[in-house]
Amino acid sequence: MIQVQTRLKVADNSGGIKAMCIKVLGGSKRRYANIGDVIKVSIKEVVPRGKVKKGDVYDAVVVRTAHGVRRSDGSRIRFDSNAIVLLNTKREPIGTRIFGPVTRELRSAQFMKIVSLAPEVL
């Protein structure tokens, strides 16, 4: 579960390394975001010559959480860290590669581009 002030890893090659959640989108009093939800993030750490700059604000989709996701068959998938993929204004990924696995829940959340770029879908 992601909330405001949560530090996240950037799981694409857009140039960001770390980001911080500044808003959970989808309702005025919404507090938590899970896998597949869109949040607003501020970039905190970048690689040199990347597409994004420190301090920039972007939309991002949550692809991995330490809290995990529960499936209808009763299983639960958890990850070691919280990770996001940065999105542009058209809700398309900024990067051209995704690092690490993503879950099937992104497929139902209309993020097929991210699912197709990911090296592994759990």
Curated annotation (Swiss-Prot):
Sorted keywords for this record are: Ribonucleoprotein, Ribosomal protein, RNA-binding, rRNA-binding
Q: What is the stated purpose of this protein? A: Binds to 23S rRNA. Forms part of two intersubunit bridges in the 70S ribosome.
HAMAP family to which the protein is assigned, alphabetical? Ribosomal_uL14 (MF_01367)
Q: Which domain of life is it from?
A: Bacteria
Relate the assembly described in the record: Part of the 50S ribosomal subunit. Forms a cluster with proteins L3 and L19. In the 70S ribosome, L14 and L19 interact and together make contacts with the 16S rRNA in bridges B5 and B8.
> Per UniProt, what is one GO molecular function of this protein?
large ribosomal subunit rRNA binding
Q: Which chain regions cross the lipid bilayer?
A: none
A Pfam family per the record: Ribosomal_L14
Q: Name one GO cellular component term.
A: cytosolic large ribosomal subunit
| Species of provenance | Vesicomyosocius okutanii subsp. Calyptogena okutanii (strain HA)
Q: Which GO terms describe its biological process?
A: translation
User: By its UniProt entry, which Gene3D superfamilies does this protein fall under?
Assistant: Ribosomal protein L14
Concerning InterPro entries, the annotation shows: Ribosomal_uL14, Ribosomal_uL14_bac-type, Ribosomal_uL14_CS, Ribosomal_uL14_sf
What is the similarity comment for this entry? Belongs to the universal ribosomal protein uL14 family.
- List, alphabetically, the PROSITE patterns matched: RIBOSOMAL_L14
Q: What is this protein called?
A: Large ribosomal subunit protein uL14
